[in-house]
């Protein structure tokens, strides 16, 4: 989230963009969804998943409309700059020319109707990659910009804490099982405690923290440097992810087909809705990365239809993954990281496949952690940046990376409850990024567009949900979710 206009990059077709967006949305959250489904009940989970997916689609169209409006503003400013330069070149005009110039200046104060008639469609073409931070600075006031960065930073901290916990948890589960009496893999029927022994005198929690320390030492230093994910690394991790998902779905279907399915999920259990909601919101998170995905698409003529198709496919995939999981495994045996349910001999006979699935999150998450850390560091720098100012070397190279790295590692040190981490991150910061920010962006950009270009201007990428009712509905849903989750957590804590 650099907060500025960046290079568009190499263009790609709409269908390639569809694949990129699918890969962006379907990530770590999908691995925690089966357990959340089993806890909340299959009917409640299905209804909430579809509704959250629909709301995410609505706000995605909001964000795309705001991107088009931002492009129009930037394009109009460039046109204004060129006109001013032309005016300076014609400073020796005659009296009649001056009169014409006076008429022109008066016309400039009115909405640009001539521009609307000539090229209003092209005016809103999305060609410049305007990041969310830049859009916030264009349409929000100073308080709004600061709240935007606070929300983004909180979400990225949650992301890093989830990643920092997921890798050591996977390593602990696999290696403790292999080194113990059950050398055949993770025993999901056994109820392990953090105080159970793993290696000799070392408890499971000790092994987890050792892995966390190794993870921090190996990947933490990247926070102090600039790093980006190469195309080939992205292709490799994407292939690993889809191979893993395909194996899990096929194996679960085979077990169910053979009559070995152990799952009997309830229809509804409202006590599990809080975690499910956070997981669902987290699993549809993409709005903060839309400028990087949408802008390079070569033809955006039917982009809204493609987005709808993408969301339908993602819903189908989440449903397939979660329903095969909850009917294949008992609810109390489903683990926070669904991949660990397949690290058992009775589920997967081939040792190589067991280790691949058990350690799959380690490889994919480890490649993402430095990227997110650098993004968070840059957001901190942007938040405190002042025009024309520079940071001292110590602040730039030591302080910002340190405040980026330390908090999520401390959170991961204190807890490795991945389902709760995902739920809290999604329910709070995720609600802000996915609902509140796009809703305010589209509302304010519409007002700004009307003031600048006139009330008859039509944004070619405007959302199908163009009525103000939808903005109010999204905000009402967001604040209702926020208060519901907060009340649930408070009531749960007071009962302990």
Curated annotation (Swiss-Prot):
Provide the alphabetized UniProt keywords.
Glycoprotein, Membrane, Transmembrane, Transmembrane helix
Q: Which residue stretches are annotated as topological domain Cytoplasmic? A: 1-10, 58-146, 226-233, 287-306, 376-397, 443-470
Instruction: Please give the GO cellular component terms listed in this UniProt entry.
Output: membrane
Superkingdom classification of source = Eukaryota
Residue ranges spanning the membrane: these are 11-31, 37-57, 147-167, 205-225, 234-254, 266-286, 307-327, 355-375, 398-418, 422-442, 471-491
Q: Where is the composition biased (Low complexity)?
A: 91-100
Q: Provide the topology term for how it sits in the membrane.
A: Multi-pass membrane protein
Its principal location? membrane
Do you know which Pfam families this protein is assigned to? Answer: Aa_trans
Q: Where in the cell is it found?
A: Membrane
Identify the residue ranges that face the Extracellular compartment according to the record.
32-36, 168-204, 255-265, 328-354, 419-421, 492-496
Q: What family does the database annotate?
A: Belongs to the TMEM104 family.
For this entry, the protein name equals Transmembrane protein 104
Q: What is the lineage of its organism?
A: Eukaryota, Metazoa, Chordata, Craniata, Vertebrata
Gene encoding this polypeptide?
A: Tmem104
